[in-house]
Amino acid sequence: MTKVIDFVVTWVDGNDEKWRLKKAKYDGSINTSKYSMNSEKAYREWGTFKYWFRGVEKFAPWVNKVYLVTDNQKPDWLNIDSDKLVLIDHKEIINNDFLPVFSANPIESNIHRIPGLSEHFVFFNDDMYLTAKVEPTDFFSEEGLPKYNTALSPIIPERYGTGNFQINDMEIVNSHFTRNEILKNGKFFDPKQGLKNVVKSLLYKNSKFICGFWESHLPYPLLKSTMELVWEKEKDILERTSASRFRNPSDTNVWLFKYWQIASGQYAIGNPKLGGLFTLDNAGPDFWSLLNSGKYQIMCINDGFNIQNEELVMNNFINALNSLLPEKSSFEL
């Protein structure tokens, strides 16, 4: 594959006093408690972001550009003169009438507006770490289609989870594609999806409606043209999400564009063993060993709601990352 591939990552420093004061002007009526949709946990900065960049440089040196999207912030250690780094402020991609925003949904729904972004790009959250070597073909096929591992799967509506967003995403997808079109295009029963996913799809294939897609919580290969197409067809809905200053149950999210690729059949099947989703809630010696084992090429490591000793876990997490990625990258001063 000879396509140019960029990476896009979003980041916020919730410890930044200037940013906190700006947020405080708007969040008076918002529930920001631990288990809420807009929990302060979502903005925590643990000092691990430099390891995200180290992973990119060590395990994906082929990447063209890395676009870091922030709210006029940057880590103190960041080398802004790095040849591959491009800093993007929210005002460059989001309508100024909607700013400031403190939710990932409007930000991620507008990443296709990044100036200079390539047609083929991979979107990362800042907790999605490269932990072993990856190739362009892990994300895109030789024909340039994004690679996903998926299945038919019901959406679980959790009070403070992403279920509301997924339901809204699927409502849009189901309004543009019939059930039969999705079943035909989705490649759900291909053995390359993995046995668990094929079995799951078989269980739900006779549902009256397409109930949802299984979400891997790994980086999202996307096509800029697909995001532009969905925006063209659903501008009003996506503008409402873009104007959503805090997470709102009526929002869509970035998975909409991935779901569109799946429903239209414009995707290739990815490796079901490429990576996994983990939480630090019960992290111990076995997990730190796993992080350094090379078993997974990508690990999404969520900080969780129920960490018992946050300071200890944070120190162990940083030590484990430093063991895997001890060398400073060109993205660092």
UniProtKB/Swiss-Prot annotation:
Domain of life assignment: Bacteria
An example molecular function term from Gene Ontology annotations: transferase activity, transferring phosphorus-containing groups
EC number(s) reported in the record: 2.7.-.-
Xref: Pfam families: Stealth_CR1, Stealth_CR2, Stealth_CR3
Keywords noted in UniProt: Exopolysaccharide synthesis, Transferase
One example of a Gene Ontology biological process annotation: polysaccharide biosynthetic process
Family named by the database record: Belongs to the stealth family.
Something else known: Stealth proteins are part of a protein family that is conserved from bacteria to higher eukaryotes. Family members were first identified in microbes as proteins that help pathogens to elude the host innate immune system. Microbial stealth proteins are involved in the biosynthesis of exopolysaccharides. Stealth proteins are predicted to function as hexose-1-phosphoryltransferases.
Protein known as: Capsular polysaccharide phosphotransferase eps10H
Source species of the chain: Streptococcus thermophilus
